[in-house]
Amino acid sequence: MAESPIVNHPEQGLCRDCLSLQKTQTSRRCHACGSPRLIRHKELYRLSLAHVDCDAFYASVEKRDNPDLRDKPLIVGGGKRGVVSTACYLARIHGVRSAMPMFKALEACPDAVVIKPNMEKYARVGREVRQMMRDLTPLVEPISIDEAFLDLSGTERLHKAPPAVVLARFSKRVENEIGITASIGLSYCKYLAKVASDLEKPRGFSVIGEAEALDFLRDKPVGMIWGVGKAFAAKLESDGIRTIGQLQTMEEGALMKAYGTMGQRLYRLSRGQDSRKVEPDHDMKSVSAETTFNTDLSAAGDLVPVLRALSEKVSRRLKAGEIAGRTIVLKLKTQDFKLRTRNRQLGDPTQLADRIFRTGLQLLEKEMDGTRFRLLGIGVSDLSPSDRADPPDLVDIQATKRAVAESAIDRLRNKFGLNAVETGYTFSKGNLARTQTPTDRDNEP
């Protein structure tokens, strides 16, 4: 549990604009500046675990850099054959969503402006936001380029303010100095901090306290459980489980018998129990990506393109973080929810999609015995700085050529978008590799 034990503040509110503490509980506006942007919660000054998520990050950066786009629906993504990377909130009103095929997005919002992603620029802005987070606490755990968990417990004396006030200051600083907005979720555990940050986007600041957790979760759909994608939610619904409240009435043993290790997660998170600590990025143990399929798959022609797409996703994160890993880990879940993990250690650390994929493929081929799989994942562990990664292969000249080609592809994708270049593995099965992903989790412990 992440709470601030130092000061018992009598005030129950905070103004997000002037940052004054609110002593009255009935006023709808700040007593100091008149702003309606007030936060009130009984545990506001005790909680210290936060999830920070920049709002429509890619689109917000583009609108910041081009004021002419401010009042226009904006989609960041590939061409007509590509997919949406992100969309501004004006476009979302029309039904545009991330990962939507571009032609469908333009059907939903024909007046949208489409911009190809500039990953170098987004990474640069992401690093600026990350540094501001580290100014608050050393306990920053990045989840992606634009979001992270922060543990501010024990920082009240340093900042001379409780974590809620420090986070509100941070939000204003990001808006004023970087020119984009962020939403904040404050709670006592990672799971509910993440849930809270999604409640009032954009420019949100939501709080979920420990005392209210069970009641808050009771009527929520099972899809709100971290790690429950569309396919698994459909499975639970077919078993008669639609709400988190139903999970709260079930025994842990029964859930584990029905759903394996995922049953334990369902039991604990449905009760707001999440003991995971915030782990700083320099202690990150692995980088991974996984997908749960709409339909259980067994054929190589279906599995291999997805493995390639996931390998490229892991590779992008390694390169963005300037890290590499020495152990490749393959993760499979069978149709009866049994988990298989296989790993292989490399001679040198890697961040190349080609090496990750080819090693993962060797592991996957040994498991393709007709078994149908509902989940496929690939990851890299034993992480280290990338300065010693992927030395030239003096034996396998083709591997060196593939590494050079991958570097060229990276430059093209950074300039023109992720779908500017596709490999032979993903091109013919592109729709499967890109859209068969109702559950897509990264770095799950």
UniProtKB/Swiss-Prot annotation:
Residues carrying the site annotation Substrate discrimination: Y58
Reactions performed catalytically: DNA(n) + a 2'-deoxyribonucleoside 5'-triphosphate = DNA(n+1) + diphosphate
Annotated residues for binding of Mg(2+): D53, D146
Enzyme Commission number: 2.7.7.7
One of the Pfam families matching this protein, by short name: IMS_C
Source taxon at top rank: Bacteria
Keywords associated with the record: Cytoplasm, DNA damage, DNA repair, DNA replication, DNA-binding, DNA-directed DNA polymerase, Magnesium, Metal-binding, Mutator protein, Nucleotidyltransferase, Transferase
Cofactor annotation: Mg(2+)
Alphabetized SUPFAM superfamilies for the sequence: DNA/RNA polymerases (SSF56672), Lesion bypass DNA polymerase (Y-family), little finger domain (SSF100879)
Gene Ontology, cellular component aspect: cytosol
GO biological process terms, semicolon-separated: DNA-templated DNA replication; error-prone translesion synthesis; SOS response
Similarity annotation: Belongs to the DNA polymerase type-Y family.
Protein name: DNA polymerase IV
